[in-house]
């Protein structure tokens, strides 16, 4: 019978993961048990994806706000620190801010507006337009912001992040001054010691600040990039990708997980004879059209993956072929012609009109986004996702 199903994404239920658990063994067993339970078989080039959360949990990669405070104080001097361009998130940044504030006498908190880097809005563009201000040049004090815009709560969380962040800083024992600006060098009017908290634009922000005369500049990836008092760390990403664990502890982005994905790949090959690909994934890279939020608070979608996931898709657009190259064909003749075109396609279709609209993005970004949507971030209990048929085409 002709095959009728293409790509399938399955959430795989797993035990609750604790520090020290043998995660590769748990992942392999969970996938094989799911296959036996649901009556499907593994195939070559299936993708087994493991959420970064359980990787970090199994590694015990945690740190406290006191660890953050100690590192911030050591690297930024413990006086007045400019904290600029943080994202607006209780889970992602608020607990980090507690630790940062504990490591300083005063925090000058500079928020971008009308939204943060990933799209969480303080105010709307309509409000900016109505107020007649220029977000590219105008610097607002807290008083001016309140005068123009009043209290604005986040559409989904109901939190006034301006007040929330200011209160966190005060509770941590530091003075706080809040300003609103979109030019990094504005902060140098207040302090020359700066912690820039943006994620994907951090290298440019660092460069701008140093060129403008900043004395000390750190990014979040410079904080906890080595253990502090025996804490966890991430040598490459520091605090980037961290999440709230408890009221005084964070879970850091997983470290050194390349060996784990390769171990899972080897174990599946040994047990089934199938050569699968394996990746660790965090946030997907999709954008919410309602809230305008780009769902990528992690520094990367995938911090580790097997070699078969390097690159981008190399696909032809079926509707382009049907409407152009083979517009006079139909039925079996059309199917045969398209199948022949797929089998004859070049190794790289960059610049080929027949590939337009085929999503030329990194495979790990595409598959990681699919997996993030499949596993969810709540109580599904499926921190492993099996994707089958992703690399198949119309002829398979």
Regions found by a protein language model. Give the residues of each.
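Conserved mixed alpha/beta catalytic, RNA-binding, or beta-rich assembly cores of soluble enzyme
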Residues: 1-44, 53-396
């Amino acid at each position: 019978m002709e095959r009728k199903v293409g790509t399938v994404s399955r959430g795989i239920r797993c035990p609750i993961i604790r520090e020290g658990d043998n995660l590769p063994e748990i992942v392999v067993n969970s996938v094989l048990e799911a296959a036996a339970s649901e009556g499907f078989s593994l195939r070559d080039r299936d993708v087994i994806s493991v959420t970064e959360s359980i990787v970090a949990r199994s590694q015990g990669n945690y740190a406290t706000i006191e660890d953050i405070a100690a590192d911030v104080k050591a690297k930024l001097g413990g006086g007045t620190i400019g904290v600029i361009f943080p994202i607006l998130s209780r889970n992602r940044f608020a607990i980090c801010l507690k630790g940062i504030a504990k490591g300083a006498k005063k925090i000058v908190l500079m928020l971008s507006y009308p939204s943060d880097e990933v799209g969480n809005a303080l105010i709307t563009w309509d409000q900016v337009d109505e107020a007649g201000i220029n977000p590219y040049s105008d610097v607002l004090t807290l008083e001016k912001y309140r005068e123009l815009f009043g209290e604005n709560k986040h559409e989904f969380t109901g939190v006034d992040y301006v007040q929330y962040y200011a209160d966190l800083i005060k509770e941590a024992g530091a003075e706080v001054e809040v300003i609103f600006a979109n030019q990094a060098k504005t902060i140098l009017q207040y302090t020359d010691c700066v912690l820039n908290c943006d994620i994907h634009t951090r290298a440019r922000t660092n460069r701008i600040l140093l060129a403008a005369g900043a004395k000390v500049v750190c990014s979040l990836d410079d904080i906890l990039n080595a253990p502090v008092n025996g804490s966890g760390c991430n040598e490459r990403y520091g605090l980037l990708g961290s999440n709230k664990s408890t009221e005084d502890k964070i879970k850091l982005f997983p470290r050194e997980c390349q060996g784990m994905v390769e171990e899972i790949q080897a174990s599946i090959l040994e047990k089934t004879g199938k050569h699968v690909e394996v990746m660790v994934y965090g946030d997907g890279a999709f954008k919410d059209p309602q809230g305008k939020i780009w769902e990528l608070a992690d520094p990367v979608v995938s911090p580790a993956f097997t070699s078969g996931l390097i690159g981008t898709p190399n696909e032809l657009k079926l509707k382009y072929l049907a409407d152009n190259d083979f517009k006079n064909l139909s039925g079996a003749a059309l199917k045969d012609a398209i199948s022949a075109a797929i089998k004859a396609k070049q190794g790289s279709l960059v610049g080929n009109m027949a590939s337009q609209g085929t999503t030329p993005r990194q495979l790990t970004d595409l598959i990681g986004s699919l997996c993030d949507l499949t596993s969810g971030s709540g109580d599904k209990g499926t921190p492993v996702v099996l994707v089958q048929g992703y690399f198949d085409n119309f002829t398979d």
